[in-house]
Amino acid sequence: MITNGVIPGLFTLLLCVGLYRLLVVPLNHLREQANAWRADQLNVRLSRRTTNRADELGELGRAFDHMSERLQSTVALQQQLLRDLSHELRTPLSRLRVASESEQGLEQLRERIGREVDGMQRLVEDTLQLAWLDTERTRLPDEAIQVQALWEMLTENACYESCWSPAQLRCEVDASCWVRGNLNTLAQALENMLRNAIRHSPAGGIVALGGRRAGKYWHLWLEDQGGGVEEADLERIFLPFTRLDGSRPGNGGFGLGLSIARNAVQRQGGKLWAQNAGSGLRMNMRLLVHTSPV
């Protein structure tokens, strides 16, 4: 009788312990990670015992870790942008203070203040755009984009802004180049790259857009005559607020354009990278082919 009562009791105890380790322990780990987030400890990760499980709790654990990594990356970027933005705003604010205390005429003072305010507005808008591109993960609407037509629109604006001749902005991609993506974000990316290329090229230089089809992708490149950059800087130029020394001609800008361009291209499934080519820098884009243009 005693044996008959002990064996079922032991079996029940072992079953409870197994269920506890199988269900309650990983749930406690998930709760601990959620509490760590609440305490701003975004670097906390679940144990491999939880994330390596092949059941729903393992899937939930991996989702928790992915969410934690994403939150940590987003918060780090926003904190870095805030620090950089506050640093970048000091210079125009100092110039505004000097201008307000100067003996310049009213017309000169207005022009100076207008320039500084416009620059600060562009800086803030670009910073907010970069932060939005990094945090906004909803899928953008796809559409068919003819690269040649997009280039013509962008170069018209660029010639007006830079006083360059249209002959200096060449398109070596024919009308058969159609890509799949979001028109607004692709236009912004290509416009930022074009402005960067013009800024760093000599006054009589050439900026050319070329490309070739490679399977289901179009490989496009934008090449300038600005002398290129050091090999070690080819990836660094995509970091926010990165401005290299005087190795390349041209000045101006806040070092946000290429970072925004890369984020914009990546948001539509593309890739953007840089390489030195010829007498300048080549920006390479890989974009999905649109196979049935209309």
Model feature map: region roles:
Residues M1-L82, S94-Q104, G119, A232, ...:
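Membrane-proximal HAMP signal-relay module
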Residues A39-L42, R90, E136, G246:
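Generic structural signal for secondary-structure transition and capping sites
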Residues R97-R213, Y217-E223, G227, D233-S247, ...:
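DHp/HisKA dimerization helices and adjoining segments of the cytosolic kinase module
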Residues R212, R286-L288:
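Residue-level recognition of strand-loop junctions within catalytic nucleotide-signaling folds
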Residues S279-M283:
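Glycine-rich GHKL/ HATPase_c ATP-binding element in histidine kinases
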